[in-house]
């Protein structure tokens, strides 16, 4: 996740927080770890496992003119919790991140080979 976020930040302007959705967001432990790994606040929403259906319904509402603009949707979905990064966890996650990126680089050809096996 951190590598992906850092790559995105090089290409486009991003926000200063992440909204964590899906079934994994039901776990406060997972949300807290994500905040520590990314070192930015992580928001969760009520019933995060249903965001796909909620998003589809809101897109339909915009299409039908019940909601004026897609930009207005953000105000309708408010976070129910915000997980702040633990500064004390930063050193261990930074160390592990460096190790992960080195392991990936050293094994990139092997990963490619494994992905070609059917």
What are these regions (language model features)?
Residues 1-118:
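Glycine/Thr-rich phosphate-binding loops that ligate phosphate moieties of nucleotide
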């Amino acid at each position: 996740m951190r590598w992906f976020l850092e790559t995105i930040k090089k290409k486009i302007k991003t926000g200063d927080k992440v909204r964590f959705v899906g079934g994994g967001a039901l776990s406060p432990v997972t949300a807290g770890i994500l905040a520590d790994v990314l070192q930015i606040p992580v928001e969760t929403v009520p019933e995060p496992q249903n965001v796909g259906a909620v998003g589809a319904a809101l897109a339909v509402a915009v299409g039908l003119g019940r909601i004026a603009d897609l930009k207005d949707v953000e105000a309708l979905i408010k976070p129910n919790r915000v997980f702040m990064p633990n500064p004390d966890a930063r050193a261990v996650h930074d160390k592990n991140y460096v190790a992960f990126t080195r392991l990936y680089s050293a094994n990139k050809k092997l990963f490619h080979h494994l992905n070609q096996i059917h």
